[in-house]
């Protein structure tokens, strides 16, 4: 980690902020929920299938939007709990993010660079170098914005195409803790209104740009932060406002769970890449993810599907699985343009093996 010589009186990394006590212990976001781990699987599996067999799940790309909601909910929960207990540290927060993200990413980039030497043409390999640099700096979304659309045929020759979403998440990790520090002394109601207003503004921006400048809307962080913000709003309302669906009947929570699953699965099954995305259609799976998380672990699909052991297993390796599956497929598309379904399935199976090992 980078050491600093800034005097403690000038700025303290663990300086206590004016805290807000959570409403009740029961209303705080749970530190670990198997159903959210299973929700990661529901997010990543359609992405994998869409990349290998796009006709099977034409809207599988919505899985990334579900990931954004999960990340917003979980990361903001960590920050909110830390600030509420006067124990939040920027250094500790970023250290944990680095330990979780960087080792696997470095291993992946090393593999991509080595394999690309044998598979790519010289000009393609030179371009790959720029993508590796951009991925290392977490600005791959901007690199792709200057080059290519996500759904174009040429995108199949970009082994690091998928890292646009990781870049947006890391940009969020950099910005959000600082925003929390700046606004924390405001009242609860003002913060709630501010979060909601930001969601509406950024969501409206995404909806407008998705029809006029699709690539900009797809890759630009401000047109994606509202999806993370949906998870943030739920986390904040649980932690500090006291919102919890536990006060509702079991049937209501079951209904929220079922509705959430349908709002995720149906767009994945029927919406195609020609839709204006991210836009109004994206609101459906985003709200679906919010409903599932809000429904709590004992809701119907949460306990039966998302807590199912195979789903939680996939959820636990979802980050590695997402990292590794696309470079394997991309190099396969380049080296074997007419790869059979069995070969594509083998590539996906290999990504599972690697994800389970790294």
Q: Whereabouts are the PLM-identified features?
A:
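Membrane-interface helix/loop caps of multi-pass membrane proteins
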Residues: 20-358
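Short, Lys/Arg-rich, polar N-terminal cytosolic tail immediately upstream
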Residues: 2-32
